[in-house]
């Protein structure tokens, strides 16, 4: 199965490539259309690639930053749509959700998404009424945390699992906890949330604690394509992150992490899945690094099984 996806995920590929119908070259290659965010933050791409692998097919995609959607084309060429994964309930995507709720006549599958409520955002999430309406119509719905369920007052029994990212990493890398404690720390930075003054402070604290420091913005570039960034996580002993997907990727590799939260979704992930600790200020980092509590393992095998189980449910229906 993995060879089927080599062209979109390879050390030789400069950037992840998807058949993005919204770019104008409308060459239909699948019967399912997947809505995703094309921002080069790798947290947007990893769940998409994982979903393709769980369905054993490369899906056509539509970048939800580009709206309105050509519903005439969509209804003519596709039998269902997938929304996900990643933080697609961020307020910047309100226009997409309103368009989806009003105009989509196909079965909807919501998969691996969550709300984003950054501390520095005045508008918090997509309007509740729109989200509830779409979820009520969905054939299947899966979200990544209780925060999303509670914020939108969704069905208490809704499927909640870790991000599909876990499956992509398990399918493409060796996943194993390091047997010997090392000194390599990867700082995964959210450039939009992490204050400018905080970045060098995090580096200083890590180095003064005796660790070897490396850095990623989790943004795919020609110099740092997806696989190269993921190799940095695999090589690290520990991860310090201000990004949710920094914690998710660390968890997927069984690397202990310390998450510094500038958005409650980070704490929501840590609460559900463990595998590290969550702090709310850089001032707490020195103490957190000196305390082995962040090294307590999560229940990775149980959680990835639950991700795969939801994938199997959708695959059987499609």
Question: Could you tell me what each predicted segment is?
Answer:
Residues 1-318:
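Active-site anion-handling motifs in enzyme catalytic cores
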């Amino acid at each position: 199965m993995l060879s089927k996806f080599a062209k979109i995920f390879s050390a030789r590929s400069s950037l992840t490539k998807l058949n993005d119908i919204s770019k104008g070259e409308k060459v239909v290659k699948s019967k399912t259309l997947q809505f995703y965010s094309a921002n080069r933050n790798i947290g947007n791409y990893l769940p998409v690639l994982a979903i393709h692998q769980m369905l054993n097919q490369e899906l056509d995609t539509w970048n939800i930053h580009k709206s309105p959607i050509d519903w005439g084309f969509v209804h003519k060429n596709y039998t269902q749509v997938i929304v996900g994964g990643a933080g697609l309930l961020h307020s910047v995507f309100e226009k997409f959700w309103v368009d989806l709720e009003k105009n989509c006549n196909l079965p909807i599958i919501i998969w691996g998404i969550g709300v984003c409520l950054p501390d520095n955002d005045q508008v918090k999430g997509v309007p509740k009424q729109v989200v509830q309406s779409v979820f009520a119509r969905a054939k299947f719905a899966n979200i990544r945390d209780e925060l999303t369920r509670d914020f939108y007052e969704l069905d208490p029994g809704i499927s909640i699992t870790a991000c599909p990212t876990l499956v992509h990493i398990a399918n493409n890398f060796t996943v194993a906890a390091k047997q010997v404690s090392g000194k390599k720390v990867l700082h995964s930075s959210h450039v939009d949330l992490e204050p400018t003054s905080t970045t060098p402070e995090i580096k200083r604290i890590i180095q003064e604690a005796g660790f070897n420091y490396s850095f990623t913005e989790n943004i795919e570039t020609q110099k740092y394509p997806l696989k190269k960034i993921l190799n940095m996580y695999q090589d690290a002993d520990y991860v310090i992150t201000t990004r949710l997907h920094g914690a998710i990727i660390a968890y997927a590799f069984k690397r202990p992490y310390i998450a510094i939260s500038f958005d409650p979704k980070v704490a929501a992930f840590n609460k559900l899945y463990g595998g590290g600790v969550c702090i709310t200020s850089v001032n707490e980092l020195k103490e957190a690094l000196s305390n082995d509590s962040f090294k307590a393992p999560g229940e990775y095998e149980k959680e990835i099984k639950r991700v795969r189980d939801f994938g199997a449910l959708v695959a059987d229906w499609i």
